[in-house]
């Protein structure tokens, strides 16, 4: 979703620095909590959070806020930010600011992906979010709150889908090319079987319980492979609408860590991945080495 650059720049340049935005920081400046009731009409509050993890809570949203994430030079390297709304998320929309002033919608009022949304900024883009209050006729209590995680992009040469971006709510098998990229770039790569699947209707998520026979990679540590007499059970989450159900055989589970939880990216049967990997390796087209044995 894009907005004219001129409109954004006008809002940022002409808006007043809201007094409410200057207060409300946590001691370490990782989080912010404030209210739109003390914000001057038409103002754009300027916020800056320097930590890799934190939270924002905007009570009675009014006007707009511009939030910069990262250290003193947030444009030094490409970065990936993930936002997870606190439900019910109401009263505002959250956009990622893009080069040229365009805005990309990340969070909106109403139901959405329980796991949140992620955005990737390039090396010349400022890591900034634009929070805009949505108009309402009544004065009911509304809260727009979310947690965020920010990390450096260690493989900026790879396409966005390799970082788990743009797959929120996607329910389709991964192509061979996507499988190979996922094996090289996912936060975790687990060889195991499905022990069971449960469904959380409230969060609109399915929870896959996996017996991890072998952990090929994990960053940060999320799983422990089963030892003799001990099953290494772990949980991986995926959107409910994907209709995941238990199946026989061994799989290669690949995905990303979001707020301490494992979220599924691709889960081919192990033999299916082996076939794709060995074919790519024979043609010298594999993006990285994967220890299958």
Curated annotation (Swiss-Prot):
Location in the cell reads: Secreted
Please report any disulfide bonds recorded for this protein chain, giving both cysteine positions.
30-51, 82-118, 171-242, 174-266, 184-288
Return the InterPro entries for the record.
Answer: Meteorin-like
List UniProt keywords, sorted A-Z: Developmental protein, Differentiation, Disulfide bond, Neurogenesis, Secreted, Signal
Q: Where is the signal peptide?
A: 1-23
Q: Which GO terms describe its molecular function?
A: hormone activity
Single Gene Ontology BP term?
Answer: axonogenesis
Annotated Gene Ontology cellular components are:
extracellular space
Q: Which domain of life is it from?
A: Eukaryota
Keyword Cell cycle carried by entry? no
Q: Subunit structure, briefly?
A: Monomer.
What is this protein for, i.e. what is its function?
A: Involved in both glial cell differentiation and axonal network formation during neurogenesis. Promotes astrocyte differentiation and transforms cerebellar astrocytes into radial glia. Also induces axonal extension in small and intermediate neurons of sensory ganglia by activating nearby satellite glia.
Similarity remark: Belongs to the meteorin family.
Q: What is this protein called?
A: Meteorin
To which species is this protein native?
Homo sapiens
């Amino acid at each position: 979703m894009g907005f004219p650059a001129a409109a954004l720049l006008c809002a940022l340049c002409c808006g007043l620095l809201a007094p409410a935005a200057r207060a409300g920081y946590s001691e370490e400046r990782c989080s912010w909590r404030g209210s739109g009731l003390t914000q001057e009409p038409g103002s754009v509050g300027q916020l800056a959070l320097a930590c890799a993890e934190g939270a924002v809570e905007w009570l009675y949203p009014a006007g707009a806020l511009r939030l910069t994430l990262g250290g003193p030079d947030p444009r030094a390297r490409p970065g990936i930010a993930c936002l997870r709304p606190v439900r019910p998320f109401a009263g505002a929309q959250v956009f990622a600011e893009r080069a040229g002033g365009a805005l990309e919608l990340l969070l909106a009022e109403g139901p959405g992906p329980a796991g949140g949304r992620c955005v990737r900024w390039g090396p010349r883009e400022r890591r900034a979010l634009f929070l805009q209050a949505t108009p309402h006729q009544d004065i009911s209590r509304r809260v727009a709150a979310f947690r965020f995680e920010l990390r450096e992009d260690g493989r900026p040469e790879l396409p966005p889908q390799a970082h788990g971006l743009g797959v929120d709510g996607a329910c389709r098998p991964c192509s061979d090319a996507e499988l190979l990229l996922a094996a090289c770039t996912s936060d975790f790569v687990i060889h195991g079987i499905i022990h069971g699947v449960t469904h959380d209707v409230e969060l609109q998520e399915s929870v896959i319980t996996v017996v991890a026979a072998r952990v090929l990679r994990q960053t940060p540590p999320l799983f422990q492979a089963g030892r003799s007499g001990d099953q290494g059970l772990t949980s991986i989450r995926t959107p409910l609408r994907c209709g995941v159900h238990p199946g026989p055989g061994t799989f290669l589970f690949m995905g990303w860590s979001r707020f301490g939880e494992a979220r599924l990216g691709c889960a081919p049967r192990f033999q299916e991945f082996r076939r794709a990997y060995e074919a790519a390796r024979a043609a010298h087209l594999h993006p990285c080495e994967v220890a299958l044995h």
